[in-house]
Amino acid sequence: FEIYNKDMLSSDKKYTLNNIPAAYAVMLQNMETITRVYYGDLYTDNGHYMETKSPYYDTIVNLMKSRIKYVSGGQAQRSYWLPTDGKMDNSDVELYRTNEVYTSVRYGKDIMTADDTEGSKYSRTSGQVTLVANNPKLTLDQSAKLNVEMGKIHANQKYRALIVGTADGIKNFTSDADAIAAGYVKETDSNGVLTFGANDIKGYETFDMSGFVAVWVPVGASDDQDIRVAPSTEAKK
């Protein structure tokens, strides 16, 4: 167990998998799926049951709790190929040359498309966007702009980071105040478009991330916001 646990804390993994948090960030946001969370991703296998938390514990738990508050509505997934600063273009490793950034948007409670503007109580304070890149050497040109449609119902609305990749690993924020105080806050335009630039998206090689991952959510949700729906046996039309 010692070798395995040490490998989880390494950025150069030999026995464990890279990007466990990013995988959960994608799965826990997906529409009409129920994600099975693996015990070994939350806790180490040595010692007593649930005795020692894994290095991914905080991020996975943050994502699971945020699912209750934010993950609802229609979904749009898209990949973008953004201009780079040229430093990574001559690498012999194909992965290190890729400039792909994957995005997945959930529009919010009772909002099924980006054009919907008639929602309900929690429509504006729910929804989220997940950003993932697999290139740890990704460096974008300063002109690069990633424009993500959060939905027109989210026009002129502030968003803040829930998780965000940094050179020191993934940072977690469990409140609006903490994320805003750290400077991780943005505002959509009049069409509900949220824009990310070269300073927002960058590849890193850390124990919990090989590439980049971030999740952004609307500012203003109450601590007890719950957008889950009641179970039903009715067939979906």
Regions found by a protein language model. Give the residues of each.
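Acidic glycine-/aspartate-rich tracts in secreted/extracellular proteins
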Residues: 135-137, 166-167, 220-223
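Conserved alpha/beta catalytic core and glycan-binding cleft of carbohydrate-active enzymes
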Residues: 1-45, 59-69, 108, 121-122, ...
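C-terminal beta-strand-rich structural cap/linker in extracellular carbohydrate-active enzymes
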Residues: 173-237
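Solvent-exposed beta-hairpin/edge-strand motifs
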Residues: 149-168
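Carbohydrate-binding surface patches
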Residues: 90-152
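Extracytoplasmic/secreted cell-surface and envelope-processing proteins
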Residues: 46-50, 139-141
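Short, polar loop/linker segments at the starts of domains and inter-domain junctions
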Residues: 5-17, 52-60, 142-147, 169-199
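Acidic carboxylate-rich catalytic motifs and surrounding loops in phosphoryl-/glycosyl-chemistry enzymes
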Residues: 38-44, 75-100
